[in-house]
């Protein structure tokens, strides 16, 4: 399944993996998974975190390594994000609930994920998704960005 991914996708997933793998040891633990989920405003229980890991933990060692992470991401991409998942993700970014993701909101979420971005990088991300050119990302633009891969 993971063999259907492009090199660019694999590189993106490697970057995502390293956001989760806080100590850089090549595996994601329940603790690391919990940290990232909480930084995104989720509040999973220990049992939920364990379930999430068990779902993809092919070798049964209780952690997720990069190949397992790739398999999980490939699976997720196949049942392309449901409308509800995309709406949920949009809400994570749209902090003030006004229906738009501003540069400040994008920066806030990325900083919570441990990604320090320059103003230029944040503006560039907004520009890429901002179809109508109003300087922010509305829900339709967000959906377009999330589903056009």
From Swiss-Prot:
Enumerate the PROSITE patterns for this protein: EF_HAND_1, EF_HAND_2
Bilayer-spanning residue ranges: none
Q: What positions does the entry give for Ca(2+) 3 binding?
A: 94, 96, 98, 105
Recall the GO molecular function terms of this protein's record. Answer: calcium ion binding
Task: Please indicate if the UniProt record lists Acetylation as a keyword.
Answer: yes
Annotated residues that bind Ca(2+) 1 are located at 21, 23, 25, 27, 32
Recorded family membership: Belongs to the calmodulin family.
Q: What does this protein do?
A: Calmodulin mediates the control of a large number of enzymes, ion channels and other proteins by Ca(2+). Among the enzymes to be stimulated by the calmodulin-Ca(2+) complex are a number of protein kinases and phosphatases.
Q: What else is known?
A: This protein has four functional calcium-binding sites.
| UniProt protein name | Calmodulin
Originating organism = Patinopecten sp. (Scallop)
């Amino acid at each position: 399944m993971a063999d259907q991914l492009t090199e660019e996708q694999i590189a993106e997933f490697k970057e995502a993996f390293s956001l989760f793998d806080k100590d850089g040891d090549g595996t994601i633990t329940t603790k690391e998974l919990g940290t990232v989920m909480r930084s995104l405003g989720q509040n999973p229980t220990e049992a939920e975190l364990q379930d999430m890991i068990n779902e993809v933990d092919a070798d049964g060692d209780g952690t997720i390594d990069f190949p397992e992470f790739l398999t999980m991401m490939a699976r997720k991409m196949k049942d392309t994000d449901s409308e509800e998942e995309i709406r949920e993700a949009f809400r994570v970014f749209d902090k003030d609930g006004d229906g738009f993701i501003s540069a400040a909101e994008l920066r806030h979420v990325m900083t919570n994920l441990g990604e320090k971005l320059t103003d230029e990088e944040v503006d560039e991300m907004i520009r890429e998704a901002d179809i109508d050119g109003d300087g922010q990302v509305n829900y339709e633009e967000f959906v377009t960005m999330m589903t056009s891969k």
